[in-house]
């Protein structure tokens, strides 16, 4: 049985919204965006594929409209469930997903 890293409680991720979670690594770590749509949690690197900028406009604050996460830097839009780019300068290149699972009411890295 493998041990997975707990990111947060499922209840911490608002329906139709997003939060950040930090992952420590030997290179200093990185931030994830955790989203929730219809109860399903998705996780992505907090980095726009267009220019490598963070997606949040302030730490942990995201612009989301009609199920689309909007990059604060250049306005690219991404589906909050799939990470697919719906419009903007990165059309056709989606967010890098990170596999997660729900364990005892917590979101964990898979």
Residue ranges, per PLM feature:
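N-terminal pre-ligand scaffold of iron-sulfur
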Residues: 1-65, 79-80, 94-110
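Short cysteine clusters
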Residues: 48, 71-74
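Short cysteine/histidine-rich metal-coordination sites, predominantly Zn2+-binding motifs
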Residues: 62-71, 85-93
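Short Gly/Pro-enriched loop/turn and capping motifs at secondary-structure junctions
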Residues: 76-77, 84
